Structure formats: C-alpha cells, structure tokens
C-alpha cells in the first residue's frame, strides 16, 4: 500500500449499489444487453484460473504493484475477466496512473458492479465482474479529465485479447 493509494482511498466515496446498471449480453459480449449473472460458488473457478488469479477474484486479494505485465502494456485490444471472459475494459481507456496497477478511465458499460469495501478502515469502492462476481479492483476519484475516475485493476484478474484476434466465448 503506497502513499498515493492511501490518499486516494480517502477520496473514494460510494458511487453505485452492487451490480447496478447491467447492459452487456452473455451471448454478445460487447453489445448493450444485460449479462446473465452466474451463480457458481468460488470453488467452481479453482481449476479454471491460476492460483494467483483465484485469490484476487474470489478472495479479494490484491496483487503486488508493478507485478503485472499488463501494467506497462498498451497494445490495442480488449481486457476480459480472467474467470468468465466477459470483456471489462478497452485498450483505448487504459492509461499509466503511475500506481503499478493496470488503470483505466472507464469500464465497458455494464461490465462491472461496485460496492463499498471497509476492509482498510476507510471506505473504498471495489468492483466486480457483473457476470461471475469475480473481484477485479477498486475505483478512485483521481483519474484524468474528463471522467475523473481511476479504475485500478489487478492485472492477474484480466485476460488480454489483441484487437486482431476474436474474443473467446464466454465461459461458465
Ligand atoms: Zn467474470
């Protein structure tokens, strides 16, 4: 936990209720239809993702800053949930926040749900994949204009698909 994260954590106030505003379709990942919410227990995903990814996604662990190859990575493409493959972010919205975690100015509409996290004494707004419920990261109010948001994501919880490759089918 670095100083920047401590300070920005204080500025992060409630934004949205959990899993509000679904707009993605399960059968058409980038379209504007609600995703089908999966009801699998965390154990369902154990053999489908790495041990490190599982801890982040289903035990809400946080990867060490600077540890993800996706942090300093700016190729064109889409960032999918590492568990269920729902597209969560586009490369156009990725930027270098200097925090050591992959950061985005906005998610794909409806791909994420948020809730307050009081784990660190002050509230932070954490967000989850709207389809499988996997924990991805936290959103802060110190992002670049005009949106002003920093969606701070664990790289290990993402799967990158280059723009010139087809998206894999959703799984789960
Ligand atoms: Zn997911």
Residue ranges, per PLM feature:
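Mid-length scaffold segments of soluble, non-membrane domains
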Residues: 74-103
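Residues immediately within or flanking Cys/His clusters that coordinate Zn2+
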Residues: 78, 126, 149
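Short cysteine-rich clusters marking metal-coordination/redox-active sites
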Residues: 81, 129-132
């Amino acid at each position: 936990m670095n100083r920047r994260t401590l300070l920005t954590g204080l500025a992060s106030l409630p934004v949205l209720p959990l899993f509000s505003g679904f707009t993605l379709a399960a059968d058409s990942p980038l379209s504007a239809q609600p995703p089908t919410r999966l009801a699998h227990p965390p154990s369902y995903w154990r053999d489908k993702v790495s041990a490190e990814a599982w801890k982040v996604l289903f035990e809400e662990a946080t990867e060490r800053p600077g540890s993800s190859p996706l942090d300093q990575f700016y190729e064109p493409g889409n960032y999918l949930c590492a568990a269920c493959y729902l597209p969560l972010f586009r490369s156009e919205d990725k930027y270098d926040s200097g925090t050591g975690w992959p950061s985005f100015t906005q998610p794909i509409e409806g791909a994420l749900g948020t809730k307050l996290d009081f784990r660190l004494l002050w509230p932070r707004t954490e967000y989850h994949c709207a389809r499988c419920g996997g924990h991805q990261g936290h959103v802060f109010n110190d992002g670049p204009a005009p949106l002003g948001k920093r969606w701070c994501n664990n790289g290990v919880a993402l799967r990158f698909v280059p723009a010139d490759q087809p998206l894999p089918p959703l799984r789960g």
